[in-house]
Amino acid sequence: MSEGEVDVAAVSQYEVLPKEVLAEVGSVKLFNRWSYEDVEIRDISLTDYIQIRSPVYLPHSAGRYAAKRFRKANCPIIERLTNSLMMHGRNNGKKLMAVRIVAHAFEIIHLMTDQNPIQIAVDAIVNCGPREDSTRIGSAGTVRRQAVDVSPLRRVNQAIALLTTGAREASFRNVKSIAECLAEELINAAKGSSNSYAIKKKDELERVAKSNR
C-alpha cells in the first residue's frame, strides 16, 4: 500500500459499533437515569420557556445563561430548579449540595409515582405559575391595585420560586430531609393538590387579582 492510501477495512472496523452501543449513544439522560424523550409540556403558552429540548447530563452550565437578560428562558428547566434551591444566605453558592438534593428528590419521586421525575417537575411548574396577578397603580396619595396578566416567563419564574420555598419551609425543623420535602412538593403540585405550598400561594395570588379587576 502506498503512503497516501488508507486501509478501508482497518478504518471500518472502528467505525461500526455494536448495536447496543449505538442505542446508548445519542440519548443523553439526566443523571444518566431520566430520559427527556417522552416529556411533554401540557401548556402551549409555556413551551418556549420550559427548556427540555436540549438534554443535559447534569444541571450545571457555569452561569452561561445569566450573562444576558432573558437568556435564562433557554436554561434547562431542571438547572433552574436546582439554582433556586441555593437561597437563604447560608446556602448561597452551594451548587453541588443543590444538585445532590435534586438527584435524591428525583429518586424518591420515581419510587413514589413510578413515573419520569422530569415529567412530574414540568407538570408541577405548569400548575404553579399564576396566570393573573395584581400590581400597584398610582403615586404618593392614592394607590390602588390593578389586576394584570402574567407573562409566560414570569409564570415559570414564580412557579420555581414557590416550589423551592415550599420545600425549604417544609423541611425547616422537620425530621424529613429537604430532598423528601421537595419530592412531596413536586408530586402534590403536579397533581394540583391543595397540600402543595406552591398551589396554595398561586390560588391566593389569583384570588387577590380577581378581587381587583
Curated annotation (Swiss-Prot):
Database matches in PROSITE patterns: RIBOSOMAL_S7 (PS00052)
Biological processes annotated in GO: maturation of SSU-rRNA; ribosomal small subunit assembly; ribosomal subunit export from nucleus; translation
GO terms of molecular function: mRNA binding; rRNA binding; structural constituent of ribosome
Keyword annotations of the record: Cytoplasm, Ribonucleoprotein, Ribosomal protein
CC per GO annotation: cytosolic small ribosomal subunit; ribosome
SUPFAM superfamilies in UniProt: Ribosomal protein S7
The keyword Ribosomal protein belongs to this UniProt entry's keyword annotation: yes
Location of the protein in the cell: Cytoplasm
Keyword Cytoplasm recorded: yes
Subunit structure: Component of the small ribosomal subunit (SSU). Mature N.crassa ribosomes consist of a small (40S) and a large (60S) subunit. The 40S small subunit contains 1 molecule of ribosomal RNA (18S rRNA) and at least 32 different proteins. The large 60S subunit contains 3 rRNA molecules (26S, 5.8S and 5S rRNA) and at least 42 different proteins.
Similarity annotation: Belongs to the universal ribosomal protein uS7 family.
Biological role: Component of the ribosome, a large ribonucleoprotein complex responsible for the synthesis of proteins in the cell. The small ribosomal subunit (SSU) binds messenger RNAs (mRNAs) and translates the encoded message by selecting cognate aminoacyl-transfer RNA (tRNA) molecules. The large subunit (LSU) contains the ribosomal catalytic site termed the peptidyl transferase center (PTC), which catalyzes the formation of peptide bonds, thereby polymerizing the amino acids delivered by tRNAs into a polypeptide chain.
PANTHER family: RIBOSOMAL PROTEIN S7
NCBIfam families referenced in this protein's UniProt entry, alphabetically: PRK04027.1, uS7_euk_arch
The protein's name in its UniProt record: Small ribosomal subunit protein uS7
Gene source species: Neurospora crassa (strain ATCC 24698 / 74-OR23-1A / CBS 708.71 / DSM 1257 / FGSC 987)
Lineage: Eukaryota, Fungi, Dikarya, Ascomycota, Pezizomycotina
